[in-house]
C-alpha cells in the first residue's frame, strides 16, 4: 500500500491515471476507516457495508463512463448514482456484490472442509470497454488467490472451517461492536 502511495506521489499532475495505483491503497486503510463506513443489516443476515462512503469512495470516475451516465441520466441523477458507495453487499449466506467494480463473488461450500470461491465480473450495458478493463484488473489485484487481498479472505474462511471442525465450542464469534446497533424499523445500522 505504501509503495502504491509513494508511486502516486511521484507522478506529474498531468500524467495518465493508473488504475493499479488507485485500487490498492484503500485496502491498507485503518480499522477506523472501515468502521466509519457503517454496516446496514436486514433480516436473515443480508447487509451492505458503506453507502454514504466506502473504501471505494475516492476511486476516480472513468471519463467515458461519466459521459455515458450524464447523457442517460443528467447531472443530478448521475451524481447521486456515482456518489453512493458500498464496499460489499452480502446476500446471506454466500453471495457478495461489489457494485463499485461490477463483481459478484460466490462462496460455495461443497463439503465440510472444501469451498469453491468464484468471482464473476460484469460489463454494464452501454458502459465503455475501459470500465470492464478496470473491473478485470480489480479482480486480479484484489480477489485472485495470488493477490494481496485474496489470501487474507481465504485464510479467514479456512480458519472458520477449522474452528467449525473443532469440538471446543459450538460458536465462532464473528461480531464486533456488539450491542451498538440502531434499529431503523426496516433495517439495523
Spell out what each predicted region is:
Residues 1-189:
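C-terminal catalytic domain of Rieske-type non-heme iron oxygenases
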Amino acid at each position: 500500500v505504501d509503495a502504491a502511495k509513494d508511486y502516486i506521489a511521484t507522478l506529474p499532475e498531468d500524467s495518465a491515471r493508473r488504475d493499479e495505483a488507485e485500487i490498492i491503497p484503500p485496502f491498507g486503510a485503518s480499522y477506523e476507516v472501515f468502521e466509519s463506513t457503517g454496516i446496514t443489516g436486514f433480516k436473515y443476515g443480508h447487509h451492505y457495508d458503506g453507502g454514504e462512503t466506502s473504501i471505494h469512495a475516492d476511486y476516480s470516475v472513468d471519463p467515458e463512463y461519466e459521459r455515458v451516465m450524464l447523457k442517460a441520466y443528467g447531472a443530478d441523477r448521475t451524481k447521486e448514482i456515482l456518489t453512493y458507495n458500498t464496499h460489499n453487499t452480502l446476500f446471506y449466506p454466500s453471495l457478495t456484490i461489489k457494485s463499485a467494480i461490477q463483481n459478484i463473488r460466490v462462496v460455495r461450500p461443497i463439503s465440510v472442509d472444501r469451498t469453491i470461491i468464484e468471482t464473476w465480473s460484469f460489463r454494464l450495458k452501454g458502459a465503455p470497454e475501459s470500465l470492464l478493463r478496470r473491473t478485470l484488473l480489480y479482480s486480479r489485484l484484489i480477489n485472485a488467490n495470488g493477490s494481496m487481498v485474496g489470501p487474507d479472505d481465504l485464510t479467514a474462511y479456512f480458519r472458520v472451517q477449522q474452528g467449525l471442525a473443532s469440538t471446543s465450542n459450538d460458536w465462532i464469534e464473528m461480531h464486533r461492536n456488539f450491542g451498538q446497533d440502531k434499529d431503523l424499523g426496516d433495517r439495523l445500522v
